[in-house]
Curated annotation (Swiss-Prot):
Member of the two-component regulatory system GcHK/Anae109_2439. Autophosphorylates in response to oxygen availability, and then transfers the phosphate group to a conserved Asp residue in the receiver domains of the cognate response regulator Anae109_2439, resulting in its activation. SUPFAM superfamilies: ATPase domain of HSP90 chaperone/DNA topoisomerase II/histidine kinase, Globin-like, Homodimeric domain of signal transducing histidine kinase. One of its GO terms (molecular function) is ATP binding. Keywords: ATP-binding, Heme, Iron, Kinase, Metal-binding, Nucleotide-binding, Phosphoprotein, Transferase, Two-component regulatory system. This is Globin-coupled histidine kinase. Gene3D superfamilies: 1.10.287.130, Globins (1.10.490.10), Histidine kinase-like ATPase, C-terminal domain (3.30.565.10).
Length: 382
């Protein structure tokens, strides 16, 4: 079984006294309750949307809520219909991960579960009030299965908390190192830059010398960029918010990224996007990092594309490449600092992309490109 270890669920089932009788009791309610599942899903998300702290997590608007309601109906169907085997619990675990991923605070999830507890108890009474012993069995089974569901949610949120703590500890150690060497590195680079300026004024028409000096200047820029990225990872620079035209931002990023002649680049749908509120410099960095990765993956011959779309108050930009994609072992930690798929990378680019996107109220996700390769999707509020 993937996800939560099997022993956790087996222990939980033994702890609450789960048995065959509970499964029979839930199935006996399923037929009468099924027509009411859409209403219960509506009530569940109405409760969540009624609280601003929970509502802000649902950045996808009506489309996202509509999808979640459909998922909730299937969740209710399986809740009462089973089978309550290892695959069932694994699916529950993945659903819990979705709520963690979208940033829905756990206390709202736990509170909203009361909608199902009271709603299903009411349906059980309507179905079995003439048979008190069966009503008692159904109510007990409902209590057990809903408590197990809450345990799954708690486990997923706990996993996320532990992962966050690990990231904070890594960044803290990393930050101490960067903070101590950043200033020391800037000083010699500044001396080199000053000397480079003086040398350029004295080379005259010597094209060969100028070519080498230009290379030195380029590498100075690379070194300064690495230091800047390192420092940006450990401090929160204030966002200089203003209306940003993403077509200009992405276009500028594309022009600044070097690519071999064998790698084609296509930009699609950018001109139709509305402005977003954000920091143009930081947003440009997002697409510079993603495009540099895409070009690297697609080289020496391949395809890179940026495709834009808009739906439900969000803009989505897919940065795709025809390279080898990302192996499954790396995907889970792809956006963590110091994780890289490049032989000579230091693993900051995607971590910085994630940080900037989230500071703009957006997200970044990885998926496989149809036909092979990688796709990184950046979503931002429009």
């Amino acid at each position: 079984m993937t996800g939560v270890p099997e022993t956790v669920f087996e222990e939980l089932k033994r702890y609450v006294g789960w048995g065959d009788g509970d499964e029979r009791a839930l199935r006996s309610l399923h037929g009468a309750a099924a027509p009411h599942f859409p209403r219960l899903a509506e009530e569940f998300y109405d409760r969540i949307l009624g609280h601003e702290g929970a509502r802000t997590a649902l950045v996808g608007g009506e489309s996202q809520v509509g999808h979640l309601k459909v998922t909730m109906i299937a969740w209710l169907d399986e809740l009462l219909g089973g089978p309550w085997d290892e695959a069932y619990w694994d699916r529950r675990y993945r659903i819990g991960r979705v709520h963690v991923r979208i940033g829905l605070p756990q206390h709202y999830m736990f509170g909203a579960m009361n909608v199902h507890r009271t709603g299903l108890a009411r349906l059980a009474y309507e179905r079995f009030h003439g048979d008190p012993p069966e009503l008692e069995r159904v109510r007990n089974a409902l209590g057990k299965v809903l408590d197990l569901e809450l345990a799954v949610m708690l486990h997923t949120y706990r996993e996320d908390l532990l992962a966050q703590q690990a990231r904070v500890e890594r960044l803290s150690t990393f930050g101490q190192l960067v903070g101590s060497i950043g200033h020391d590195l800037r000083n010699p680079l500044g001396v080199i830059e000053t000397s480079l300026y003086i040398l350029r004024t004295r080379t005259g028409e010597d094209e060969r010398a100028r070519k080498h000096l230009d290379r030195i200047g380029e590498q100075l820029g690379v070194a300064n960029g690495i230091i800047t990225n390192l420092l940006d990872m450990i401090r929160d620079r204030p966002l200089a918010r203003e209306p940003v035209e993403l077509a200009a931002v992405v276009g500028g990023a594309a022009e600044s990224v070097r690519r071999p002649t064998g790698v084609s680049l296509a930009l699609e749908g950018l001109d139709a996007l509305p402005p977003v509120e954000g920091d143009p410099g930081q947003l440009r960095q997002v697409f510079v990092n993603l495009l540099e990765n895409a070009v690297f993956a697609a080289s020496p011959e391949g395809v890179v594309a940026v495709r834009a779309s808009r739906a439900d108050g969000l803009v989505a930009l897919d940065v795709e490449d025809s390279g080898p994609g990302v192996d499954p072992a790396t995907r889970r930690r792809l956006f963590e600092p110091l994780i890289t798929t490049k032989d000579k990378g230091i693993g900051l680019g995607l971590a910085l992309v994630k940080r900037i996107a989230e500071r703009h109220g957006g997200t970044v996700e990885y998926s496989d490109r149809p036909g092979g390769g990688a796709r990184f999707t950046v979503r931002l509020p429009a």
